[in-house]
Structures are given as structure tokens and as C-alpha cells.
Amino acid sequence: MALKNKVQLITYPDSLGGNLKTLNDVLEKYFSDVFGGVHILPPFPSSGDRGFAPITYSEIEPKFGTWYDIKKMAENFDILLDLMVNHVSRRSIYFQDFLKKGRKSEYADMFITLDKLWKDGKPVKGDIEKMFLRRTLPYSTFKIEETGEEEKVWTTFGKTDPSEQIDLDVNSHLVREFLLEVFKTFSNFGVKIVRLDAVGYVIKKIGTSCFFVEPEIYEFLDWAKGQAASYGIELLLEVHSQFEVQYKLAERGFLIYDFILPFTVLYTLINKSNEMLYHYLKNRPINQFTMLDCHDGIPVKPDLDGLIDTKKAKEVVDICVQRGANLSLIYGDKYKSEDGFDVHQINCTYYSALNCDDDAYLAARAIQFFTPGIPQVYYVGLLAGVNDFEAVKKTKEGREINRHNYGLKEIEESVQKNVVQRLLKLIRFRNEYEAFNGEFFIEDCRKDEIRLTWKKDDKRCSLFIDLKTYKTTIDYINENGEEVKYLV
């Protein structure tokens, strides 16, 4: 299935107007000619993590709408939805049955009880110390209702104890049947792309980091890709890992996220030097989705491990913190840098990270749109939103700094901002200009400049950025064969 080589929007189901119907109205009113696709962050009933602890996929959270709202949107846009392939909610019917009946539950094999890893079911500290942890311990303890016995079950994620997010055993035939049902549901309502969220964590194996365990993970990924394809669905893998892992996935034909680009662009604009960006652009896989911002923070570790000196990385992090950002940190000393650098993600809006400088922000988007891949723009970034400190204070969740919900009046006002109008014009150019379906060139220039070019047949467009001033221009050949200069 051919995906549209056009910019996509990323949004929560309730962040642009309050629900899916209003989201569709907003898209039709303001952005009908702007986006080729829409990534709707989890609209399913969920018990936590703003949708990422799914109770069921068979229905949409009623306050957001119904599956038919998704189907209507799919008439005009490539729809992308998340499949939390690593876990489900502890309030799902499957885990609720397990909580009641324990090992006698017909769904017991869907979950990872500790005896699947350690024969006696007792965790070994030395093994856990080798793991790439997302919480202090990778399991939670639950009491079984009918027996009163305690069961320890694997829970990679979750900020509560016990966790709301219960890991699935992807080697279980029950889990594979469950995933097939999800693909079928998605296909029935017009979903074209499925993002496998947290897929790097699905294989648990003692003696490893329990993150992207090779070669076992490839068996699962190949199975998932084949099954999704049978329903006309493309898979997009969400894997935060070292650069080498991204290359391995790309070589196996998987669509992946370019999680390295956001920090690289930020570094380039803050330091007014193209060196890191040029080195990266010459060595990255092509079949990627590009982004600068998303519902999580700007990736740092482990995505940039080996690509940047931690001292230089810390300088950029410190500037972002001065501009209002907060940080998500790495758990486990083994996965921190030797000098103790432990920043996992920088939580802030991309516009705020660039000090709300319109020209710098448009330069960043121009770099993103000229980088090979399908670009995605997060809804806060679309409206050049600033850090939402009130949301952080209210929720005690650092990532809420970049998850502001916009009402209709606020959307109308934001769309009229000069920086947003300039961004919309740039998005339209990226979508419509034919050369972006051609060949990409990185042009030699001074270190304080950027020159990137796309060519196809008689069409050519060249991006020039003066990093000293952030002035951004695009020279292109129009339909009459004339050279036009476009000041972004």
C-alpha cells in the first residue's frame, strides 16, 4: 500500500476541539489541504497514561466519539493509530479475569508471570540490574481474589504501584489471536498505518537488557508485519534505541521513526553549525517518518548514544531547561553515560525550545520537511504552542508541558498567528512540489549555512538557511519553468 508522501498531523482525540467529531470539523475548516494523514493518539478506553493503558480496542472512548468518527476521517486522510503491543490495562477483561482466578483464568497465559523467566518465580537482582528499566522494578505484585495468593506479573511501564500497564506475552498464541483481532478492527474502520508502541520491550529474556532482544524480536516483527499486510495495514515501529538498531530495522524493510533528527536540528540551530546535521543526513536510513515534536519529549538517550559527546548534549539540555523544559531521566546506572549523563527526553514544546523565535522555528521545520521521509507535525507545534506550566503543576506530569488542549476559539486565534500562517504555507509547498518524490542532495557550503536540494525531471527545489540569522529561503522551478525565490 502506497502512503501519501505528505505531511501528517499528530494529535490526541480531544486536543483540537474536545472530541473526534470536532477534530474532523477543525481539519475540514482549517487544514483540509494541509495534511495527507492524521495520527490520532490512543482514542480507546484507558486506565492511565493518557490513552496508553488500553482497556479495549473494540470501541472508542465514548467521550471522544465512536469508530465511525474515525471511519469518516479516513475518507480524506491516511489514519494512523497506536497498538500498545507491549501491554494492556489492568482493567482489561483479560487481566480482570486473571486477578479473579489466577492461573485458572483462561487468559492467564497472556501475561508474564515471573516463573516464565525464573524457574522458581523468584527474581534475581543481578539479572534485573542488566535490564533497561523504565521503573524501579519491572514487575508488580497482585493479590488473586479467589485464592488470596500473590502473583508477580511483568510491568515494564507505569507510574503507579501496582502498575496500570500489564505486559503481554507476545509468544502466547492467545496474545497473537488478540493482536489479529485488533488488526481486523483497525482495517474495518479504514486505518492505514499502525504504530507499534513500545515494541522494543516485547521480548523478555534473562541475561539481556530485555530491550530489543535479538534475534527473537525479529520473529515477532516479521509475524506482525505479515499479518498487518494481510489487512492492508502498514506498520510503523516506535523504538527508542541506538542508531545501529534503526539501521537494522530499516534494512529489514520496516518503517521507523527518525528519533535522532529532533535533537540534531535543535543542536544545529542553537550552535549555528551544520556539522552534526550534515554528518547525520549522509548516514541515515531513508524509509523513516520524521518529527520534531510529539506527545513525549525530545529524545536524547539512548537514541543519540555514540552520535554526540555528552558534554555537548548537556549544553543543549541546559539551554532548554533555562527556557522552561523539564527532563525525563534514565533508570539504572548501567544505561547512564560514564560521566553520569542520564537525560532520556527533554519535555517542552519545540517552539519554546527555540526561545519562541519564529525564524528559528520555521528553519527547523524547513530542515525537517527537506529531510527524506514522511514528515509529522504535532498539534502543539502546528499552532506554535508554548510550554504549558499550569498543566504540569496541575497533573504533576512533566510531559503535560507539551499536551495543551485547544478549544475552538483558541484554535481560531492560533491559526491566525503569523508564524502559523508561514508554517502552513511551508507544509503546502512540501506536499505539492513534485521534486520531493525525486532525488535528495546535500550541498557543500559553509558551516554556518545549510543547503539541501530535491530534484525530479525538470523540477528542482533548494533550501538555503543562514544559521547566523535563521533566514530561510527556497529556490524552486515553477510550472512555467521559471526560477522562483520563496522566503519562508
Swiss-Prot record:
The record marks D296 as: Transition state stabilizer. Keywords: Carbohydrate metabolism, Glycosyltransferase, Transferase. Optimum pH is 6 and 6.5 for the synthetic and phosphorolytic reaction, respectively. Thermostable. Has a half-life of 60 hours at 60 degrees Celsius. InterPro entries: Glyco_hydro_13_cat_dom, Glycoside_hydrolase_SF, O16G_dom_2, Sucrose_GGa_phosphorylase-rel, Sucrose_phospho. Changing R135A: Displays similar activity as the wild-type. It is an enzyme of class 2 (transferase). One of its GO terms (molecular function) is hexosyltransferase activity. The active site is at D197 (nucleophile), E238 (proton donor/acceptor). The keyword Hydrolase does not apply. CDD domains: AmyAc_Sucrose_phosphorylase (cd11355). The keyword Amino-acid biosynthesis does not apply. One of its GO terms (biological process) is carbohydrate metabolic process. Changing K301A: Displays similar activity as the wild-type. Changing H344Y: Shows a decreased ratio of activity on phosphorylated fructose over fructose. Sucrose 6(F)-phosphate binds at D49, H87, R195, L196, D197, E238, H295, D296, D342, V343, H344, Q345, R399. Its EC number is 2.4.1.329. Optimum temperature is 55 degrees Celsius. It catalyses: sucrose 6(F)-phosphate + phosphate = beta-D-fructose 6-phosphate + alpha-D-glucose 1-phosphate. Belongs to the glycosyl hydrolase 13 family. Sucrose phosphorylase subfamily. Monomer. Catalyzes the reversible phosphorolysis of sucrose 6(F)-phosphate into alpha-D-glucose 1-phosphate (Glc1P) and D-fructose 6-phosphate. May be involved in a new pathway for the degradation of sucrose, which could become phosphorylated on its fructose moiety during uptake via a PTS system. To a lesser extent, can also reversibly act on sucrose in vitro. Is also able to catalyze transglycosylation reactions in vitro. NCBIfam families: sucrose_gtfA. This is Sucrose 6(F)-phosphate phosphorylase. The lineage of its organism: Bacteria, Bacillati, Bacillota, Clostridia, Thermoanaerobacterales.
